[in-house]
Structure formats: structure tokens, C-alpha cells
Amino acid sequence: MTPESVHVYIVNRNRVSCTKRLVEWLLASGTERITIIDNDSTYPPLLEWYQSLNGGVAVHQTGENIGPWRAWDLASSMEVEPFVFTDSDVVPPPECPGDLIGKCLSVLADAPGCDKVGPGLRLDNIPTQNLTQEYFQGQSLHAWESQFWMRRRE
């Protein structure tokens, strides 16, 4: 299995700009198999963009909002090989290496018994002060994500 052949599943509902950026990043990184699991989106610009997709990007319409956990079950039921599962708003920053999937595969190979690996979210740009309603969950998000930064791997 090559990093390019790893199937990437993106769960999405009504998000167009970040989903576009993520798909563009994946394609630029050489990813060959991308499936967007759409949770019953209704946003016209997103639906129009879906219609324009081709070349290694498929959209699986669920017909209802099944949420992230059932979307995970759907993706894992279709795969026996390692795969990527991500939210549509997790867009790698410019400093993220293009061979991210390959690095994750290496970590999996070096860690018997490990069945999930992934990059950590940057924590230095998550507001922890509840300055606006938009960042109301900042504290709990920071606390949750901190657990994944116990040991850094390059």
C-alpha cells in the first residue's frame, strides 16, 4: 500500500470552503481516493461544487444527517486496509508535510497493536478565553486535544 492509494473519507455537512481546501490539499499531495460522506447537506454552493468534482473524488450522499460516529462506521465497514477519516474542517496548515499520510503509515507500522494515528491539532491558536460565542467550547477543546500531545513524533 502506498500513501497515495490510502482511501480518505471526509465527513461533511454544509461546509464548502474548508472542504474545498482540504480536497485541494489532498489532491496536491497525490491522494488518489477521496470520498466525501455527506450528511444531508442543503447548502446550494456546496451541492453545485459536488457536481463539478471528478478524478478521484466521490461523494456518498447519506440521505440523512447520520453524524460523525455513524459516518465512521460506514467508512470502516467499507475498508480492510488502513484508511483516513477526517472532518471537513480539519485543513492542514501550510507547514504540514505533503507526505502526512505516509508518515502516519510509518507510525502504524512501527506501533504494533495501534489502530489509529493522526496529526495533532495546533493548540497555540485555539482561544481559551470565552471572548465570543463562537469560541465557547475553547477550554474543553484545548483540554481534550492536549491528551494527544504527550509524545511528539516527527
Language-model features, listed with the residues they occupy:
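Conserved catalytic core of nucleotide-sugar-dependent glycosyltransferases
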Residues: 67-69, 76, 91-154
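Acidic donor-binding segment of Leloir-type glycosyltransferases
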Residues: 25-61
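Active-site acidic short loop of glycosyltransferases
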Residues: 3, 77-81
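A short, glycine-/small-residue-rich helix N-cap motif at loop->alpha-helix starts
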Residues: 18, 63-72
